[in-house]
Structure formats: C-alpha cells, structure tokens
From Swiss-Prot:
Molecular function (Gene Ontology), one example: enzyme binding
PANTHER family associated with the record: PROTEIN CASC3 (PTHR13434:SF0)
Family the UniProt entry places it in: Belongs to the CASC3 family.
PTM sites of type Phosphothreonine: 357
Domains: entry comment: The coiled coil domain may be involved in oligomerization.
Function: Required for pre-mRNA splicing as component of the spliceosome. Core component of the splicing-dependent multiprotein exon junction complex (EJC) deposited at splice junctions on mRNAs. The EJC is a dynamic structure consisting of core proteins and several peripheral nuclear and cytoplasmic associated factors that join the complex only transiently either during EJC assembly or during subsequent mRNA metabolism.
Chain positions covered by the region annotation Necessary for RNA-binding, interaction with MAGOH and localization in nucleus speckles: 137-283
Protein name: Protein CASC3
GO biological process, one term: nuclear-transcribed mRNA catabolic process, nonsense-mediated decay
Subunit composition and interactions: Identified in the spliceosome C complex. Component of the mRNA splicing-dependent exon junction complex (EJC), which contains at least CASC3, EIF4A3, MAGOH, NXF1 and RBM8A/Y14. Identified in a complex composed of the EJC core, UPF3B and UPF2. The EJC core can also interact with UPF3A (in vitro). Forms homooligomers. Interacts with STAU in an RNA-dependent manner. Interacts with DHX34; the interaction is RNA-independent.
Gene: CASC3
Regions of compositional bias (Acidic residues) in chain numbering: 74-84, 93-108
Length: 703
C-alpha cells in the first residue's frame, strides 16, 4: 500500500506540475479558502468528480489538496480547522475516486476496516497526503470500495476516525467487538461497580433521559388509608358477587355445586340422607328399642355411627360403604339419617346384619328389616322391609359397643372398603329363605374400615334379633359371638355372617361377639381377636372343599365336599366349582347365585383389601363373596352345586374356631360359641409403643 501510495503521490506531483496553470487558476487564496470550503462541503463536492468528468476535476481537486499540503494554502485549511485539512483530503479523496480509500475509512467506521485503517495510520501523514493525491485512475482500479457520492461515505472528519482507530487501543473488556467486552453502562449495569474507574463520571453526561415512566407504576398497589377498613357487606357483594365473610350463613355463601361425598355413594342414596339419618336413627331407637339408641347416636355423633347405620344401610342399600350415599335402595333414605361415611360403613354392615337379623327376627327388628329392606325387599321382599326408616337405627345402636375410635377407624377404612368391597347384587327375593333376606340382598361389602363397626351396630340390633332369634341362638352360643367378636366377626354385618336361616343365630352370635367386643375398641378388634388362632384373612370366604358346620355358620356355608348333599339348613357347602371369591384371592369376585335362595344367603362380595377378620368367619370387613361369615353370610353359592359337606373333622369343635384352608381362615361358629372368649383385652390407647432396642440389640446392630 505504501508503495502504491508513493507512486500515486509522485504521479500526482507530476500532474500538479504539468497542470500548474490549473492549480494557479484555483489561485492560492482560492485554494486555501475556496478549496477548503470545497472540502468542507465534501458531500457536495463528492459528487463533483463524476460530474466534472473524471480526471480533470479530480486532478484539480488533487492539486488543490496536494498544493495545500505543500503550500501555505493547505496549512491555511488545516489551521482553519485542525480537522479540516484531513477532512478535506479524505472528502476530496473519496469524492474524487469512485473507490476512494476514504471508503475504507467510512467502512472502518463500521468496524470493517480496522486493520486497514491501522495500516494507513502507520503510514506517515505525508503518506496520507500522498494518498490524497492518488490519481483517480489508479484508484479506480481498486475494487470493492464504495462509489463516492453514494451517501455512504463517512461524514466524520478523518482525524476523528483516525483517532478512534489507531491512537485509542481499547482493552479487550472495553472493545464491544471483543467477546470479552464487559458492558459498563446501561440500565442493567447501573449498580455494577466492578470497573468503576471513570464510570461515574462518564455516565451522567451520556444520557439523562429516562427510558420509562415511573409515575403510575405502583398505583395498583399503593397504600390507601381509605381502603384499610373492612369492606361493607354491600361492597363485598359488589366485588365478589356474594358475601365472602359469611361462612356460617349458608344462604349468604356463594352457591356452589354440591360436592359428592368423598367416598361416592350409590345413586339410590336419598339426597337428604343426612337429614334422614338422624330421624331414622331416632325412629330406630324408638322402634328397635332393643337396640340401644345411644349406640347409634354415639356412632353417628362420633362418626362411629358408621357401623350402626351402615349395617342397615349397607344391607338394604348395599351402599358402597365409603360412599356418602348408601346403596340401599330404601337405604338411601334410611342411611341418610346417619352420618354420611359412618353411616355408610355401618349401613353396609349393619344392613347386612340387620337384614339378617331382621329377616330372622322381623318383629324386634322391624326397623332392622327396613334397613335391609332395599335389598331385602329386592331379595326376600321381606315385610321387615316396610320399616326401612326404623330399621337402620337399630343396627346403628348396636354399634354403641364399638368405641368411637373404632367407629372412626371404620369410617376411615370405608374408603378402602368401598374400593375393595364389591357390592353383592341382591339375590332374587326367592333366593332368600324365610328368615329375613336382608342377607340375601348382597350388602355391598362394608368398607374395610367399617366391617367391625357394623358388627357392633348389629350387635345391638342383633341382641334384639337374637332375643327373637333364639332359634339361631341355639345354634350359636353366646360363646360363639365371642369368637365372632373378633373384629372379623364384628366387622361382618350379621346378615353377611349368617345365612338366611342361620342369620338369626348369627345375629345372636354376632350379638354375643359384639357384646364381648362391644366394649372393645376398634383397635383391639383390629388386633387378632382373642378368639382362636388368628385366622388368615377373614376370608372365611368359603373355600372349596371346606365344610362349614351349619351350627357354626348359620348361613349356608359352602365347603367343597364330595357329595353335593346340602348341609343342614344352617350349614352350607360351598362347591369347589362355586365361584365364591376368596376374600384374599379374588377381591371383587361375586359368588354365583345360591341354588337355594332360601338356603343360602345372597352372595356377598368381599373386598379383598379389607382386613381379614382375625377370628371368625365374618371378616370385620366384608369377606370376599365366597367368604362365609358366620352362618350364612350373604355369600352367593353356586346354585345347586353344594358339594358334600366336608367331614366335620375339618372343623373340630375342639379346635380353635378358625381353621385356615388354602389361605382362607374358616371359623366354626359352634365352637366359637363355646368359646365365649371376649375380644382380647383392650389395647392401651396407644396402638403401637415404640421402644428403643435394648442395648445388646443396639450393639449388635451397630456391630
């Protein structure tokens, strides 16, 4: 570049000499003033070269420039404006040539030609002058430069450009083009004090204008004294559409969609069941005097009512245990009276028990039958069904024995039970024997939580029933109830526990069991009932090939037997072929319909998730449909397929009330009767005591 420039400079000098007349015509004064002025108007003169026709004009300009450089005229220009000399040169230069190097400068401004500009700076000012004198033709050979006069040329004085380029070398962190550049200005960095050398001085002069307006910025959130007082009711209503503060006053509260009960209840449930429950319970108390009203009340009040109400309800309604509404067709209303969840549990259990009890003993349990009636009526179409309202309370009362805690637990379990227990479809009325068919109606299995409570509730009702069902009693000794008492039994509604005929006995037993366990808390019941060996799950579900002593089970107990001969009315054989769901094995299986509706209780579905009753057949929760709970639970048995009763040895009386077959525990009600064992002593209030391991154990563990 330097060589080229020198050549150009020499050529220019020659041109100047040869065209001295031209330069003279410009006149040195002109050159000084006029030429300077021309350079000053660089933009306009920039277009001159092309207009002037090329070289002559260019030469003239160049002469002016070069002459100025060498003569006083140039010094005049520079002296006028220290920047102007260079500016003139650069302007003319770019103006002269279509591709003046000044283009480079302007580009450099765009940060394109920094290196070039540095190289140019390296060249002496004389070189620059020479550059200014470059011939247009030589320059025109340069390609890629902007055409002069296209408006892109730099308007900035060269001096400034040069100063920017060369003299000032920016640090990496200050050079915007360098990735290491650290911004030190701008809103985001106004508090960044890292490189604060001149920062504070520089900032103020730069920009004083605000980029945004703060005026109304916090209007929406300003503290206003007049807004600090509580709003009036009118204001609240205007704001929210209702008075958000009046939670006690339902009418004032914003109308909301009525939520389903947490556990969902069968649709049949009476929408007003909540209100009804109380009425019914009172009614039952009155009607079923036998049942202690307090039991029902306690259960309900404490939420323990689940048992009482649920029994009746579940029986009749087969409500889903956990559901707020009870299945019971009638139960809807009946159950309604009880507390929602507890009632449900209780309803299902109680209804089963009551139904059984009622069916067995309609007179004392007219109310109970009513409880069971929805399903009872369907299954047995028992007169007791007529007393649906009255019936539910009695079962609830039986709950009284249950402790509140038990009721509460039961309730809690209800949700599980609902999931686990399937309702057993009510058998046809014909299926159920003369005894109230409440059992027949499959009570939906009570939720696991509810099973115990229902038994208790049944207990009160059962007591009545038992009194009336002395017959049943014969089979079931009070002792039986005790074995039944174990929460399994308790948990099972009587109706479930007992077969259609046997249910009365079963009720009796249950009663007894309840009495035994009545005082017991749910927790104690949850413990393995004292009665005999803890049964595996209370699946007393009828196991194939297992025989249940009729005495033991009031309801038909199925057992797989070789001979199909039916057992005594109270005893029932379950065919192996029968689909009695094993409570543990087949959670939601529904048993096949019994061949003898009268003989066999309606199928009971057992929810597998329910805790198995520990002692008796009757699981606290409803056993799987196949499970027999005390007598004829409502388990359906395959009709006509009664296997011959298994040998009695299966259930030796001497043996503990429970035997386990195939993972199912079967209890011999008769034996259990004999064993009036009350439920195990109540557990201490704290369900589990956690003690630190003895030091030895600890040391072992550590070692």
């Amino acid at each position: 570049m330097a060589d080229r420039r020198r050549q150009r400079a020499s050529q220019d000098t020659e041109d100047e000499e040869s065209g001295a007349s031209g330069s003279d015509s410009g006149g040195s004064p002109l050159r000084g003033g006029g030429s300077c002025s021309g350079s000053a108007g660089g933009g306009g003169s920039g277009s001159l070269p092309s207009q002037r026709g090329g070289r002559t004009g260019a030469l003239h300009l160049r002469r002016v420039e070069s002459g100025g450089a060498k003569s006083a005229e140039e010094s005049e220009c520079e002296s006028e404006d220290g920047i102007e000399g260079d500016a003139v040169l650069s302007d003319y230069e770019s103006a002269e040539d279509s591709e003046g190097e000044e283009g480079e400068y302007s580009e450099e401004e765009n940060s394109k030609v920094e290196l070039k500009s540095e190289a140019n700076d390296a060249v002496n000012s004389s070189t620059k002058e020479e550059k200014g004198e470059e011939k247009p033709d030589t320059k025109s050979t340069v390609t890629g430069e902007r055409q002069s006069g296209d408006g892109q040329e730099s308007t900035e004085p060269v001096e400034n450009k040069v100063g920017k380029k060369g003299p000032k070398h920016l640090d990496d962190d200050e050079d915007r083009k360098n990735p290491a550049y650290i911004p030190r200005k701008g809103l985001f960095f106004e508090h960044d004090l890292r490189g604060q050398t001149q920062e504070e001085e520089v900032r103020p002069k730069g920009r004083q204008r605000k980029l945004w307006k703060d005026e109304g910025r916090w209007e929406h959130d300003k503290f206003r004294e007049d807004e600090q007082a509580p709003k009036s009711r009118q204001e609240l209503i205007a704001l929210y559409g209702y008075d958000i503060r009046s939670a006690h006053n339902p009418d004032d509260i914003k109308p909301r969609r009525i939520r389903k009960p947490r556990y969902g209840s069968p649709p049949q449930r009476d929408p007003n069941w909540n209100g009804e429950r109380l009425n019914k319970s009172h009614r039952h108390q009155g009607l079923g005097g036998t049942l202690p009203p307090r039991t029902f009340i306690n259960r309900n009040a404490a939420g323990t009512g689940r048992m009482s109400a649920p029994r009746n309800y579940s029986r009749s309604g087969g409500f889903k245990e956990g559901r707020a509404g009870f299945r019971p067709v009638e139960a809807g209303g009946q159950h309604g009276g009880r507390s929602g969840e507890t009632v449900k549990h209780e309803i299902s259990y109680r209804s089963r028990r009551l139904e059984q009890t009622s069916v067995r003993d309609p007179s004392p349990e007219a109310d109970a039958p009513v409880l069971g009636s929805p399903e009872k009526e369907e299954a047995a179409s028992e007169p007791p069904a007529a007393a649906p309202d009255a019936a539910p309370p009695p079962p609830d009362r039986p709950i009284e024995k249950k402790s509140y805690s038990r009721a509460r637990r039961t309730r809690t379990k209800v949700g599980d039970a609902v999931k686990l227990a399937e309702e057993v479809p009510p058998p046809p009325e014909g299926l159920i024997p003369a005894p109230p068919v409440p059992e027949t109606t499959p009570t939906p299995p009570t939720k696991t939580g509810t099973w115990e409570a229902p038994v208790d509730s049944s207990t009160s009702g059962l007591e009545q029933d038992v009194a009336q069902l002395n017959i049943a009693e014969q089979n079931w000794s009070p002792g039986q109830p005790s074995f039944l008492q174990p929460r399994e039994l308790r948990g099972m509604p009587n109706h479930i526990h007992m077969g259609a005929g046997p249910p009365p006995q079963f009720n009796r037993m249950e009663e007894m069991g309840v009495q035994g366990g009545r005082a017991k808390r749910y927790s104690s019941q949850r413990q393995r009932p004292v009665p005999e060996p803890p049964a595996p799950p209370v699946h007393i579900s009828i196991m194939e090939g297992h025989y249940y002593d009729p005495l033991q089970f009031q309801g038909p107990i199925y057992t797989h037997g070789d001979s199909p001969a039916p057992l005594p009315p109270q005893g029932m054989l379950v065919q192996p072929g029968m689909n009695l769901p094993h409570p543990g094995l087949h959670p939601h299986q529904t048993p096949a319909p019994l061949p003898n509706p009268g003989l066999y209780p309606p199928p009971v579905s057992m929810s597998p998730g329910q805790p198995p009753p520990q002692q008796l057949l009757a699981p606290t929760y409803f056993s799987a449909p196949g499970v027999m709970n005390f007598g004829n639970p409502s388990y359906p048995y395959a009709p006509g397929a009664l296997p011959p009763p298994p040998p009695p040895h299966l259930y030796p009386n001497t043996q503990a009330p429970s035997q386990v077959y195939g993972g199912v525990t079967y209890y011999n009600p008769a034996q259990q009767q004999v064993q009036p064992k009350p439920s195990p002593p109540r557990r201490t209030p704290q369900p589990v005591t956690i003690k630190p391991p003895p030091p030895e154990v600890v040391s072992r563990g550590s070692s």
